[in-house]
Regions:
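Non-heme Fe(II)/2-oxoglutarate
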Residues: 1-83
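Catalytic core of non-heme Fe(II) oxygenases with the double-stranded beta-helix
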Residues: 67, 71-184
């Protein structure tokens, strides 16, 4: 489905100190191999996705950050009916790691993922590669601002997007999904 606008973003809006705090906080937990699919159908597939993840369960200050940006973008752009928020995912991409084109939407009743929030936590001087790209119908679209630390993007969850392989260093991101009743 095409949306107008296809995404909403804030360039380097989250302070570096907050990004660094989230990175350090995330490092205090044990991450696991990322999977593709959802819930019970989740599986490891290194041809599609290779990274480590950890879910921040009930970390209110982190939930508040992603919630704020989702609400602002949704009110400004789409006005989707949102009824809940999943746990934010802290993602670590090391050299050779990536996530190929995919969408975040889920169609599991009674709610579905409607909006995705992605935040680049990393200083762009600490990694190479790891480009966030979207498929808006004309092939890969690169939003260069997503390379900057603290940049936030919100987009409809059925939008195809990917992170290209990191070639050097480590890229950290925070992703969150907001859900609601099925579209009518």
């Amino acid at each position: 489905m095409k949306y107008d606008p296809p995404y909403w973003f804030w360039d380097s809006n989250i302070p570096i100190s907050v990004c660094d705090s989230i990175i350090e906080y995330g490092k205090s937990f044990e991450s696991e191999q990322a999977t593709v699919g959802y819930g019970e159908q989740g599986r490891i597939d290194p041809n599609i996705r290779k990274s480590k993840v950890f879910f921040f369960e009930n970390i209110h200050w982190i939930n508040g950050i992603t919630n704020q940006y989702c609400a602002l973008a949704n009110t400004s752009a789409w006005n989707f009916e949102i009824s809940g928020q999943q746990s934010p995912q802290y993602t670590i991409y090391r050299p050779g790691e990536f996530y190929d084109f995919h969408s975040d939407d889920s169609t599991f009743a009674p709610v579905m993922r409607k909006l995705s929030v992605s935040i680049n936590l990393s200083d762009p001087n600490t990694y190479e590669g790891g480009q966030f790209e979207m498929n808006l119908g004309e092939g890969p679209f690169v939003l260069e601002e997503m390379n900057r630390q603290g940049t936030v993007i919100v987009f409809p969850s059925d939008t195809q997007h990917r992170v290209t392989p990191v070639t050097k260093g480590v890229r950290y991101s925070l992703v969150n999904w907001f859900e609601g009743p099925a579209f009518k």
